[in-house]
């Protein structure tokens, strides 16, 4: 079985306390933009299990590194110990974005990948308040990016992990943390953060080797396909102001007919109206993709992991049963080790429709603002613009989104809502004794 190296944190650096190669099972989920989890089960009576007692971190290879967050010891006929935790980059969730002294926001105007690196640097390593510094961390800045493609990040009190996840998901950026020998003293180890971009290995490109999944190619053992037609792809973002004077912007206004799925985003906290397009783009990214595949790869293809494909790469799925062909990004890879068995499970596309993500969307209280700049930054936009200047829209579009014809409006006073909302409304009496008035929109 593959060795798992176990580390303890000390003031001088991370210290190797033991190596485990006799575990019962080990599963580790790596994610491109998010943060995965892992679980390790072993017999507590073994010599190795006793050596690693009190460990803080684990490492199997580049990227498969985790922080220990939970320990369970089931003492019965067998003394079973189970360690659980998250990917090593999950340590970022222990910090919030603190602005510099005498500043309302932490402002960074760079390429999205460099923004992530600067957030890591200012909030984990070179903090204004030295009590916030997490020791034994290094940030790798070797990524090559287009410096003309910029966003403006203005962070204030948002969770560091959430902020990075938002940017990484919106801009298809990968990030991870690994354990490496300390540069100043290789007797100790340190945590190193990396930011990277996956490689395009899809069918219709010729620069890189292709990564094509297909049952007839015998590289898929099992698959679970999910398509959801209700994922929003067009966002009406409403900023400051009231009524017809409220600043608004439509992201991806080119979608038409039944292919257009609209969502309203309340962005009244955004002071600068040029930030509205990016707020819409990042919120749309949270809803995930229409297509999502969960696939168990064949054993032969699993052996090519790290050489023929890697987390974050773009490939192509040719599903003969459904008659579809789609390009996808490898957003999640789970390695499962049990005795002498090894399997690889992958997720293609972002699946953000689970309950936890929905709650996060509705309860997020971050005061972070992002502004996109540069011709290559994308993000859609209304009125045919490049995305950085909000275009005026007909206020009736807001009314039709929030209160379509047939909607009911409750009021504690007898005032026709048309005076503030527009449209035509009539009093609606459902019967019974009510302490409020009800209006129904007719046109």
Predicted feature residues:
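Trimeric viral appendage architectures of receptor-binding fibers, tailspike depolymerases
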Residues: 1-18, 31, 216, 345, ...
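Short conserved beta-strand and strand-loop elements enriched in small hydrophobics
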Residues: 4, 53-62, 312-320
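Intrinsically disordered, low-complexity terminal/linker regions enriched in Pro/Ser/Gly
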Residues: 11, 104-130, 262-272, 278-288, ...
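Acidic, low-complexity/disordered segments
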Residues: 17, 76-77, 83-85, 240-275, ...
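Oligomerization/assembly interface segments of phage tail-like spikes and tubes
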Residues: 30-45, 79-91, 167, 237, ...
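Amphipathic, non-transmembrane alpha-helical segments in extracytoplasmic/periplasmic proteins
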Residues: 31, 40, 85, 102-138, ...
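Surface-exposed cap/loop segments at beta↔alpha junctions
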Residues: 46-141
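Short beta-strand-centered interaction patches in the first periplasmic/extracellular domains
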Residues: 70-92, 135-231
